[in-house]
């Protein structure tokens, strides 16, 4: 992992998430550290323009949008990445306990959705943002916010994707659930890596993303489903993420979910 642009803040701590899991593998985010966390102290002056010149994708979430200076720094980072031709990936990852109130969270996320080329949310977040869980509402949200690629993860059922030209549910995989922490992050990584295989050499990655065929998108989401599924077969977040060899073997031998 390249940590060239990692910044240490002597006055702040790394934000921690505390996760409680049941014997069935279901999880609940019990709490986060909230006071003097380094991620909330990111400033525009911390951003290195050279970093974006060599990048292909910028991925961000909504926690950095809760308050300044991180909110303005995040928006500036998106602008800088866009200027350098990066794809913008956004997983709002709603954590209401960190926000002053739910309405501020909803408003902020809706305002920031148009910044992104790729947005990933789950069914609970879809209902939070639109008032319902129907996939038709997801397609309406994509159109309203002009999002080139919107993905709704559906737990064991897989994931739904919608672009301007295509929409489809891609089935998930049958697994023995151990613990689900890190599944969403793994899914995001699978999507980004899959997209880059198709669009990284294009002079206009956003246009290349929009031109992907249904079969190409289906293959990308299937791979992402595989990464997310494998992340659920081990305890922990980072330790559960698979190697390429593990992923290839899983995709070639595993059965899709019957749900």
Label for each model-derived stretch:
Residues 1, 86, 237:
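Short glycine/serine/threonine/alanine-rich loop segments
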Residues 31, 68, 129, 170, ...:
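Residues that scaffold the ATP/ADP-binding catalytic core of kinase and kinase-like folds
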Residues 1-62, 249-259:
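Conserved N-terminal subdomain of the carbohydrate kinase-like
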Residues 57-140, 147-149, 157-159:
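Conserved beta-alpha-beta core of the PfkB/ribokinase-like small-molecule kinase fold
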Residues 18-22, 104-106, 136, 166:
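Short low-complexity, flexible loop/linker segments enriched in glycine and/or proline
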Residues 36-45, 98-104, 131-132, 208-209:
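Short gly/ser/thr-rich secondary-structure transition/capping motifs
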Residues 79, 134-259:
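Conserved phosphate-binding/catalytic region of the ribokinase-like
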């Amino acid at each position: 992992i390249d940590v060239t642009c990692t910044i240490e803040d002597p006055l702040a701590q790394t934000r921690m998430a505390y996760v409680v899991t049941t014997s069935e593998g279901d999880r609940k985010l019990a709490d986060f550290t909230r006071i003097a966390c380094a991620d909330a102290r990111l400033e525009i002056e911390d951003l290195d323009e050279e970093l974006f010149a060599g990048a292909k994708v910028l991925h961000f979430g909504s926690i950095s949008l809760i308050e300044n200076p991180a909110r303005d720094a995040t928006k500036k980072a998106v602008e800088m990445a866009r200027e350098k031709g990066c794809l913008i990936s956004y997983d709002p990852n709603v954590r209401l306990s960190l926000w002053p109130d739910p309405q501020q969270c909803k408003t902020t996320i809706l305002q920031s959705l148009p910044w992104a080329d790729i947005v990933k949310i789950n069914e609970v977040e879809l209902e939070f943002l639109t008032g319902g869980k129907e996939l038709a509402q997801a397609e309406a949200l994509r159109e309203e916010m002009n999002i080139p690629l919107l993905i709704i993860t559906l737990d064991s059922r897989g994931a739904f994707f919608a672009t301007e030209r295509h929409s489809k549910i891609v089935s998930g995989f049958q697994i023995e659930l151990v613990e689900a922490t890190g599944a969403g992050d793994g899914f995001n990584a699978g999507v980004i890596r899959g997209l880059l295989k198709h669009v990284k050499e294009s002079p206009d990655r956003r246009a290349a993303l929009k031109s992907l065929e249904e079969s190409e998108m289906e293959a990308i989401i299937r791979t992402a489903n595989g990464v997310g599924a494998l992340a659920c077969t081990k305890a922990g977040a980072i330790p559960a993420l698979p190697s390429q060899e593990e992923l290839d073997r899983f995709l070639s031998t595993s059965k899709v979910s019957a749900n």
